[in-house]
A protein has these predicted regions:
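Conserved small-residue
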Residues: 16-18, 23, 76, 104, ...
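Pocket-flanking alpha-helical
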Residues: 86-88, 109-113, 246-248
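Active-site core segments that coordinate phosphate-bearing ligands/cofactors
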Residues: 5-6, 115-128, 138-173, 180-201, ...
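N-terminal glycine/serine-rich phosphate-binding loop of ATP-dependent small-molecule kinases
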Residues: 1-97, 125, 153, 222-226, ...
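Short alpha-helix plus adjacent loop in nuclease-associated cores
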Residues: 100-117, 447-448
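Short beta-strand-loop/turn "lid" adjacent to the catalytic site in phosphate-handling enzymes
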Residues: 64-102, 130-134, 161, 165-186, ...
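A conserved helix-loop-beta module that forms one wall/lid of the active-site cleft
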Residues: 202-214
Length: 505
């Protein structure tokens, strides 16, 4: 029987699945890792230890758990956190820690420099939007200005998925979906290296070859087979970013579909049949031919609940270690005992700056309205509602500002384990949201793409028919009215305090 492997490397955890030709999961595995935060605003990974190390561990564990021969795996799909940057040598050895996505603000001086040099209009023309911390070109420029020897020595500047593909196949590639984050280093019309665009940042030969995410980049090499346990010669997909793979995992295939990914951060992908121009968002090419992804992302989601767990629920964490209930379940229970609106407590969830729609890496988190009657459960509730407000802000931009219909909102990621959070999103947005039948995330999307590329399915439409919805959450319209009445306070809190936030940095 043929099997298809999908592995995703995330911010704080990596996951993998093996599926059969009917998209049934036959084995799954995960492992945790730490994100380095050596300075305020710096977030980085050791690519060799985390990205490659996790991939090798998971591939071996999945083969063992499924009790299959490696040769039964027909195709390998992969994804990883996007908008990151690691310089590598000719053998794909990392030359420096990988700079992570928008949460890493070290390239802000380069972004400011580019905006000053080009002006906003020209910068938007080059980057597709106002340059921000999720763009990779400013990160490349950071290496050039701060680690010039590494910059000069680098054979390629890669994202995590490109790095993994190169380790597996020996070929340096990147898919079109992630290549958008490298603008203006690629030409969006031809997807070839833009030599003029590279001039300010790097050599043209330091860029990877652009392909489709579902293209076969190559096959498992001898060395990769030894390290991963996979069979030599197994086809490997180019791969893509975790958010794109996560959207695929939920069945977000058609214009009008929207994915809300609740992981360490929140990420949104709305599928459209045409490109839009909006400096607040990240519109670009999507994985599926003929579709465009209006993408957006916050800097905190699960990372904020993890902070609350760590700082306010140490007793629950200790109890969990001793065999008690999961600390996150305790937090959800406490939040559920607090009514909508958290008794007047609001949270601005900008604990690591903010990406869309604010594009402000110096934004800061706020709990507003605290009184003696508020408990830690109120703070959890307010944090979940604060993230729900950011979801609603993106829904409004898509529907009200661009007149695009949102037919379905699919929730995915670790946040779907929290019923209070899902209900808050439905209530703040005032619309139903659904949870995919399979919620293991991007690794499942990777396996689906491997099944498609490996011949188990002939089209995206055929693949869509085997996926489904596990749960639909209807909004409480009374709660929606309460949230709507306080929306202006949430918005004004940032607008009136952003200058003070910047003074603190």
């Amino acid at each position: 029987m043929p099997y298809y492997l999908g592995i995703d490397i995330g911010t704080s955890a990596s996951k993998g699945v093996l599926i059969d030709a009917e998209c049934r999961i036959v084995a799954q595995a995960s492992c945790q890792h730490e994100t380095e935060n050596p300075r305020d605003g710096w977030y980085q990974h050791d690519a060799e230890a985390i990205w490659w190390g996790d991939f090798c561990r998971l591939s071996r564990e999945l083969i063992e758990r499924a009790s299959i021969e490696a040769s039964q795996i027909r195709c390998v799909g992969l994804s990883a956190l996007g908008c990151d940057c690691v310089p590598v040598d000719e053998d794909c050895h990392a030359l420096a820690p990988a700079i992570l996505y928008g949460v890493d603000a070290r390239s802000k001086p380069q972004i400011d420099e580019l905006l000053s040099e080009y002006g906003s209009d020209r910068a938007r023309e080059l980057f597709g939007h106002d340059p921000c911390s999720s763009d990779i070109a400013p990160k490349v420029l950071w290496f050039k200005e701060n680690m010039p020897e590494v910059h000069e020595r680098a054979a390629k500047f890669l994202t995590a998925s490109s790095y993994l593909c190169a380790k597996l196949t020996g070929r340096f590639t990147i898919d079109r979906y992630l290549a958008e984050d490298f603008l203006p280093l690629y030409d969006r019309e031809t997807w070839r290296v833009n030599e003029r665009g590279c001039a300010r940042f790097c050599r043209p030969d330091q860029m990877a070859e652009v392909m489709a995410a579902t293209d076969i980049a190559g096959v498992i090499t001898d060395r990769a087979a030894d390290e991963t346990g996979l069979a030599k010669g197994t086809p490997v997909l180019v791969g893509t970013g975790d958010s794109g793979a996560e959207a695929i995992s939920t069945g977000v295939f058609c214009p009008g579909d929207m994915m809300v990914q609740l992981g360490s951060t929140a990420y949104f992908i709305y599928l459209a049949d045409h490109m839009v121009d909006d400096a607040r968002l990240w519109p670009g090419t999507f994985i599926i031919p003929g579709t465009y992804g209006i993408c957006a992302g916050t800097n905190t989601a699960g990372a904020l609940t993890a902070w609350l767990r760590r700082e306010l629920y140490r007793d629950a964490v200790d109890a969990e270690r001793s065999g008690g209930p999961d600390a996150y379940e305790v937090m959800a229970r406490d939040a559920g005992q607090v009514g909508p609106g958290a008794d007047g407590l609001l949270c601005l969830p900008y604990f690591a700056g903010e990406r869309t729609p604010l594009n402000d890496p110096e934004a800061r988190g706020v709990f507003f309205g605290l009184t003696e009657r508020h408990t830690r459960g109120h703070m959890v509730r307010a944090a979940l509602e604060g993230i729900a407000y950011t979801v609603a802000a993106h829904v409004d931009i898509i529907e009200r500002d661009h007149g695009l219909p949102i037919e379905h909102i699919m929730l995915v990621g670790g946040g779907t384990k929290n019923p209070v959070w899902m209900q808050a999103i439905a209530d703040v947005c005032g619309r139903e949201v659904s949870v995919a039948k399979v919620t293991v995330g991007a690794c499942f999307g990777d396996a689906l793409m491997a099944a498609l590329a490996g011949g188990a399915y002939s089209s995206w439409g055929e693949l869509a028919r085997v996926l489904g919805v596990a749960q639909t959450i209807e909004p409480d319209m009374d709660a929606h009215e309460l949230y709507a009445s306080r929306r202006h306070i949430f918005d004004e809190l940032y607008a009136r305090n952003c200058d003070l936030m910047h003074e603190l940095v």
